[in-house]
Amino acid sequence: MLSLPYLMRPSLHLPTMTEDLSNIHLSKAEFQEYGYRLVDWLAEYFDNVDQYQVLPSIEPGDIRNMLPVSAPERAETMDEIIDDLDRVVMPGVAHWQHPGWYAFFPSGASPVSALGEFVAAGLATQGMMWSTAPAATEIENTVLDWLVDLLGLPSSWRLDEGPGGGVIQMSASDSTHLSLAVARHQFELSGADANSLVAYGSSQAHSSIEKGARIAGFKHIRSVPVTQTFGIDTDAFVRIVRDDIDSGLIPAWVCSAVGTTNTTAMDPIRAIAAIASENGMWHHADAAYAGSAMICPEFRELQDGVELVDSYTFNPHKWLLTNFDCSVFWVADRSKLIETLSILPPYLRNETEGNPAAIDYRDWHVPLGRRFRALKLWFVLRSYGAENLRTFIRSHVAWAEALESRIINDSRLELAAPRTLALVCFRHTDGNDATRELADAINASGSAYVTPSVTDDVAYIRVSIGSTWTEQRHVEDLWDLIDSNAGLK
């Protein structure tokens, strides 16, 4: 507790009771004026993003050198601040929304999502509990129940129908970390030695598995070999699990990738589920990218057996027209998640405790505070409708299939992995150096950006089609760029 002398120390300046603070804020008229200007600015950006070079031509430190060393003592005008969007910010923007962005996986966005984010920022609710944010809480659990149905997931994951439930996290990495923490807690409750727990993922699994396992206190992390199509080799998985058991260790957690980052390879969920069940393991499914495609029924066979997993994550902020951050995490039994994370100090007690209709999302993730992330997702699902979202996904897959066909029929090129959904991985038949040279030529064009990668010492180029503003003509332009540089003159 603070001592009385500390509390009585004089301040350099204390506002008087008559001091008016309203003049330090934007007035209603000013807010409207600058709000309209910024909407116009963003609208122009959306309409002309293809006119920019995909990646900026700057060096590390260039943007910082344009900024003052210290924060301003006196207020600057909004005119000055908005002008600096063009002068300072835009020269250093990597244009993830460019139609020629084919690198990594897409970073979803849309005008509707931006408007939802704008409203959420203005409302500035703190959604830690139902009592502090009833609308934010109930819109979130309703929208996530909608998604259970839209993606063909088990109805028992709906908050209103079963023991499961969903929550929006910052990223799939956070979801993976949580699943590991819950698994560890369940084993500790049973009396298991936490130092003996083992986590498993394929050699192609996302790096967040290793990071999450470290944070969750797992001492043993296994990388399971994959088959020729880059999915987990279940025979190898069984052998590794048996070896660990023979060594006195406890198999505790395994991840099935519903689309690996490198090649969108699919792990055999149903077969992995059988091994996990036999050994009492927590089974997590990471569908960060591919999960959005499950809105199209024809792609759901890619995650056959999903009803058997204990937790599942996907990112609307990748391929469902919703801007970062928005990652959905479902658990088959929400009581295990809440039991792991619930801490109730006196200052968080409230009159709705124990009411099943009053969800306190503070018990569903690590932070206490949380943003109104569901609002932009609610805007997107309502504004586009499932029909248009399916058209969006199917178009990208069709364009990827057409690009794949051109690669197959070009003797200079070859596929580096089977195509799944809208990611095409290919290489130059002259080998690794030629492949890297081709990737460099594409990226140097300024009109397209692809990701070079390597698996088992084989270099290849990833083309991920999924940007909000990409159209068929842009993919055809990319092919022309590949074709004109594949000769490697």
Give the location of each predicted region.
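N-terminal entrance/gating region of PLP-dependent enzymes' catalytic architecture
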Residues: 15-163, 444, 448, 459, ...
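Short loop-beta-helix segment that forms the pyridoxal 5′-phosphate
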Residues: 147-181, 222-225
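Short Gly/Ser/Thr- and Asp/Glu-enriched loop/turn motifs at secondary-structure junctions
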Residues: 161-163, 417-422, 454-460
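Conserved PLP-enzyme active-site core in the AAT-like
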Residues: 174-336
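Active-site C-terminal subdomain of aminotransferase-like
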Residues: 304-408
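Conserved PLP-binding catalytic core of the aspartate aminotransferase-like
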Residues: 414-442
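PLP-dependent enzyme catalytic core of the Aspartate aminotransferase-like
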Residues: 455-489
